[in-house]
Amino acid sequence: MIQLSNVRKSYQIGKETFDVLHSIDLDIHQGEYVSIMGPSGSGKSTIMNIIGCLDRPTSGTYQLDGEDISSYKDKELAAVRNRSIGFVFQQFQLLPRLNAKKNVELPMIYSGIGKKERQERAERALEKVGLADRMLHMPNELSGGQKQRVAIARAIVNEPKLILADEPTGALDTKTSEAIMDQFTALNAEGTTIVLVTHEPEVADCTNRIVMVRDGNIVPASSGQRSVGE
């Protein structure tokens, strides 16, 4: 489903060029549950941004579901994001003036889905993540775990093939983090491909494959980790 081939990423700042990714090769198949780990500045978030069509590789190719999108323009990338990818972020990214249900409706507005269908699908998504009784609550009336569940509902409401989660438990306590990871595991069991970025080994251990990134390269996992990805 995801194929990065010889992907490099560099940034030009003034006269200096900074290489962030070096010849990344990564395959992730439909239905996999993969974590990307690495220290701060390793390049893991850059890989996530490229997979999520939020950034482009400087060179190399990126195929998503058999479609080479390496050279897509901004408008084309936005269409791919809205059609195929759901996002979950550490800080939830909920609009504070909209209730839970209306926050979940947002991706469908961008997709041009009618009001009645939007409402029905948002309700089903919130029920799926256990928030049937919180649909009309504002974000400031929800706990951290509930906010993240709203974010997950928003990510799945368009039925994407792929969910990308960037440090999804980073702002949560241990018990709430476990509940959120259970939610991802359940979604993956239904066939959704999930890729998450984390620096927490206990979170990565919930996934089926661990991709280790260091200094812009994919490297073998340490002996204490049960899986690696390339």
UniProtKB/Swiss-Prot annotation:
Its EC number is 7.6.2.-. It comes from Bacillus subtilis (strain 168). One of its GO terms (molecular function) is ATP binding. This is Uncharacterized ABC transporter ATP-binding protein YknY. GO terms for biological process: transmembrane transport. One of its GO terms (cellular component) is plasma membrane. Residues 2-230 form the ABC transporter domain. Its main location: membrane. PANTHER family: ABC TRANSPORTER ATP-BINDING PROTEIN MG467-RELATED, LIPOPROTEIN-RELEASING SYSTEM ATP-BINDING PROTEIN LOLD. It is a peripheral membrane protein. Induction: Expressed in exponential-phase cells. Keywords: ATP-binding, Cell membrane, Membrane, Nucleotide-binding, Translocase, Transport. It is an enzyme of class 7 (translocase). Pfam families: ABC_tran. Belongs to the ABC transporter superfamily.
